[in-house]
UniProtKB/Swiss-Prot annotation:
Gene3D superfamilies linked to this entry: 1.20.1270.10, 3.30.420.40, Actin, Chain A, domain 4 (3.90.640.10), Substrate Binding Domain Of DNAk, Chain A, domain 1 (2.60.34.10)
Function according to Swiss-Prot or TrEMBL: Acts as a chaperone.
Gene from which this protein is expressed: dnaK
CDD domains assigned to the protein according to its UniProt record, in alphabetical order: ASKHA_NBD_HSP70_DnaK-like
Keywords: ATP-binding, Chaperone, Nucleotide-binding, Phosphoprotein, Stress response
Protein induction: By stress conditions e.g. heat shock.
The name this protein goes by in its record: Chaperone protein DnaK
């Protein structure tokens, strides 16, 4: 019987790679064209599906050639081709099926399992979509792991005994990511992520294309953009030139018979110096510097704390990129593994772990943004803070906001702002069948659980009746890395203003709760209450109501402190008079949070 093999797949925006473990060592598999990288492009022509290099060559000439589908994963958008609409998962599945097919030919037997990598900032919907793409392609996705974690595995950092902090600089074809990881005791933990979801090696290619178009117009009186085939050749040559300039100071651009000019065929011969190329792309290099600084800041470390800097993505071969990294971090980056293949190698290693081929490595990833629920007054109450290591399960006890409330709405939010409305709404569900009781008495346990693949499940349970509702968050809109960073930045910029709003809301909720409590005490005690005590309570209630109307938060807080102390003394005196030791049911659970779930 053939030994179980689990494919390690880097399903990239621009290119994809597949690797396996063979004799306990990672091996990157070549596609039918003899390359280890396969363009993540699918084209349809005459009812035929074309994937990879052949499809990429049709991008300019075939309107039914589809690239960068990874950007749409997890959304409800579709792409039109072959006289029908395709979901992003379906197109990704065709890429995965192609990788699976040529991997099986290399291996010599069928393979049904895979580990697939995703960016660390991918949300639940994007991760679920990736798993579904694998399923459509005939693959059982054993694990979804973050790309920077896979890179660290590939570099063998799990074999190091000492604690390490590592920065992964990933410049792909269409996206750019920076991640900071911590390695301790053979475990990886992603501390932070940053980047630019619309920056990649293609942008460097485009600068060369623009330079070529300008030069060809000036020297040959021909506009390559007017001819789709000519433009395709220009883009191919631009990529080759970029690669050449990583190893040599000058590259010759040769494009024979590019098109027809006034005087016959146009044969282009141009030279581009590395110094010119670096000058025209300096602004792109600069765009990668800020995410490095941001990632370090989020991880709360200095550049001097880094033990390793790892390079991922073919574009990191550019000398200007390496020079900028070394200058910014004062550390030479590790270039010991092919940057095009490193993520797939890491995925294959994780596959080897799952297949029992490699001794166990524990991978720890983190949540990119805080997860919580909306509580009374519109407060965003966090349950799982940003950068919490996953897998994780956290629970908190909440209660009702109204007397005799039998149903609560659980609104799940994601973000760093203190008010729910300022964060991203991920989903909501109702828990009904709560036993009627005074506000604050029912105990509703809300639990968040995030599994190893980053999929979030939220449940709410009435501890008395046992009634429970659960949802798996599968939001149809996704967050790009820029949006995540923007949310973090907005939270920082609005921290003081948000804190004031939150303080006002919490004080209002506290005052309304005390008014409710005092009015209930007067009603419950009836004639037993001392007239003078009753008059004092009614006066205090009115003072609170007046301050609420006037929205004087500071005065209201002072008055609350005074009245709460008086109310406590009154409650103790009443209890002694009644000669009862009956205690407040809420006092038995120190974990009950003093924030109630609002009634929808």
């Amino acid at each position: 019987m053939a030994k179980e093999i689990i494919l390690g797949i880097d399903l990239g925006t621009t290119n994809s790679v597949v690797a396996i473990i063979e004799n306990q060592k990672p091996v990157v598999l070549e596609n039918p064209n003899g390359k280890t990288t396969t363009p993540s492009v699918v084209a349809f022509k005459n009812n035929e599906e074309i994937v990879g290099d052949a499809a990429k060559r049709q991008l300019e000439t075939n309107p039914e050639a589809i690239a960068s589908i990874k950007r749409l994963m997890g959304t409800d958008k579709t792409v039109r081709a072959n006289e029908r609409d395709y979901k992003p998962e379906e197109i990704s599945a065709k890429i995965l099926a192609y990788l699976k097919e040529y991997a099986e030919k290399k291996i010599g037997h069928k393979v049904t399992k895979a580990v697939i990598t995703v960016p660390a900032y991918f949300d639940n919907a994007q991760r679920e979509a990736t798993k579904n793409a694998g399923k459509i392609a005939g693959l059982q996705v054993e694990r979804i792991i973050n790309e920077p974690t896979a890179a660290a595995l590939a570099f063998g950092l799990d074999k190091t005994e000492k604690e390490m902090k590592v920065l992964v600089y990933d410049l792909g074809g269409g996206t750019f990511d920076v991640s900071v990881l911590e390695l301790s005791g053979g475990t990886f933990e992603v501390l932070s992520t940053s980047g630019d979801n619309h920056l990649g090696g293609d942008d460097w290619d485009n600068e060369i294309v623009n330079w070529l178009v300008k030069k060809i117009k000036e020297e040959y009186d021909f506009d390559p953009k007017s001819d789709k085939m000519a433009l395709t050749r220009l883009k191919e040559e631009a990529e080759k030139t970029k690669i050449n300039l990583s190893n040599q100071s000058v590259s010759t651009v040769s494009l024979p018979f590019l098109g027809m000019g006034k005087n016959g065929p146009i044969n282009v011969e141009l030279e581009l110096k590395r110094s010119e190329f670096e000058k025209m792309t300096a602004h792109l290099i600069d765009r990668t510097r800020k995410p490095i600084v941001d990632a370090l800041k989020q991880a709360k470390i200095e550049a001097s704390d880094l033990d390793e800097v790892l390079l991922v993505g073919g574009s990191t071969r550019m000398p200007a990129v390496q020079s900028m990294i070394e200058h910014t971090l004062n550390k030479k980056p590790n270039r010991s593994i092919n940057p095009d293949e490193v993520v797939a190698i890491g995925a294959a290693i994780q596959g080897g772990v799952l297949a029992g081929e490699i001794s166990d490595v524990l991978l720890l990833d983190v949540t990119p943004l805080t997860l919580g629920i909306e509580t009374l007054g519109g407060i965003a109450t966090p349950l799982i803070p940003r950068n919490t290591t996953i897998p994780v399960t956290k629970s908190q006890i909440f209660s009702t906001a109204e007397d005799n409330q039998t149903e609560v709405t659980i609104s799940v939010v994601q973000g760093e702002r203190q008010l729910a409305a300022d964060n991203k709404m991920l989903g909501r569900f109702n828990l009904s069948g709560i036993e009627a009781a005074p506000r604050g008495l029912p105990q509703i346990e809300v639990s968040f659980s995030i599994d190893v693949n980053g999929i979030t499940t939220v449940s709410a349970k009435d501890k008395k009746t046992g009634k429970e509702q659960t949802i798996t968050i599968k939001n149809t809109s996704t967050l790009s890395e820029e949006e995540i960073n923007k949310m973090i930045q907005e939270a920082e910029e609005n921290r003081e203003a948000d804190a004031l709003k939150k303080d006002k809301i919490e004080t209002t909720v506290r005052a309304e709760g005390l008014i409710n409590q005092l009015e209930k005490s007067i009603t419950d005690q009836g004639e037993k209450i001392d007239p003078k005590q009753k008059e004092l309570l009614e006066k205090q209630i009115q003072e609170l109501k007046d301050l609420l109307k006037e929205e004087k938060t500071d005065e209201l807080k002072l008055k609350l402190d005074q009245i709460e102390a008086a109310a406590q003394s009154f409650a103790q005196a009443t209890a002694q008079q009644a000669n009862t030791s009956e205690s407040d049911p809420k006092a038995d659970d120190s974990n009950t949070i003093d924030a109630e779930i609002k009634q929808d």
